[in-house]
Regions:
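Retroelement reverse transcriptase polymerase core
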Residues: 2-272
């Protein structure tokens, strides 16, 4: 296994470095994938997708609850100023969210505001400023595991597959009745999110809770869950393919999906 920090270190020092991985052939990239892995991806084509379906997900055993301290609510403040370009982009993205049913119009007495962050490619990412809400929210007691302890469980394994399920946040629902608490306001309208949003405190912990609940019989046997990553580890390729199948089957059972580009195919090393 090679950590991201190790890679950054050797690159900064100008050291010659070689990294090997098994990936899929696509768009003129030379890659290798075993027939067995390709068969699994074909079998679970409704779990590993090029892009996630933009529809409201079903409720799971664990939804994201938002509990506020009694008598407290976020302080009201004036909306952020937006340029004409930002305002047009906001209207566009809100329309897309309405079309997917990720949000719905709201009359809730909350006024959390929208702002924009510029991406590396120059496009705009719409964000909701939940900082004031997070300050009055009762904290989830779930403890994020120490990554060093997770690595201890992987020491005998020789094959690894990593599923990056960050996009899974949009596949988790806000607990019924709590949607109004994350209402965002714009110049003209108010909307409440029906799915878990990235800026909410302990959103990663909620996702970990769901994954640990779903994969209870597999955790510490051949998978570890860390934030929005699932790492499948095995001592042989035969075992690894079987473990991979079991994980994909569980994800299919709960109607949870991953983007294909977020999948690190079976290899003898991976990046956390």
């Amino acid at each position: 296994m090679v950590s991201t920090m190790q890679v950054e270190h050797v690159l900064k020092n100008g050291e010659m470095t070689y990294l090997a991985a098994m990936i899929e052939v696509k768009q003129d990239k030379f890659v290798e994938v075993t027939d067995a892995v390709a068969g699994l991806l074909e079998e679970f084509v409704n779990v590993i997708l090029p892009e996630l379906p933009k529809t409201l997900p079903p409720r799971h055993a664990v939804d994201h609850k938002i509990e506020l301290f009694p008598g407290l609510k976020p302080h009201s403040k004036a909306p952020y100023r937006m340029s004409p370009m930002e305002f047009a982009e906001m209207r566009k993205q809100l329309t897309e969210l309405l079309d997917t049913s990720y949000i719905q119009p709201s009359t809730a007495p909350y006024d959390i505001h929208v702002l924009f962050q510029k991406k590396q490619d120059g496009s705009l990412r719409m964000c909701v400023d939940y900082r004031a809400l997070n300050k009055v929210m009762v904290k989830n007691k779930y403890l994020i595991p120490l990554i060093q302890n997770l690595f201890d469980r992987l020491c005998k394994a020789t094959y690894f597959t990593k599923l990056d399920l960050r996009s899974g946040y949009w596949q988790m629902r806000i607990a019924e009745g709590d949607e109004l608490k994350i209402t965002c306001v714009t110049r003209n309208d108010s909307y409440e999110f029906l799915v878990m949003h990235f800026g909410l405190t302990y959103a990663p912990a909620t996702f970990c809770n769901l994954m640990n609940d779903v994969f209870y019989e597999f955790v510490d046997r051949f998978i570890v869950v860390y934030l929005d990553d699932i790492v499948i580890y095995s001592e042989s390729l035969k075992d690894h393919l079987e473990h991979f199948r079991k994980v994909l089957s569980k994800l299919r059972d709960i109607n949870c999906m991953s983007r294909k580009r977020s999948l690190s195919l079976p290899s003898k090393r991976f990046f956390f």
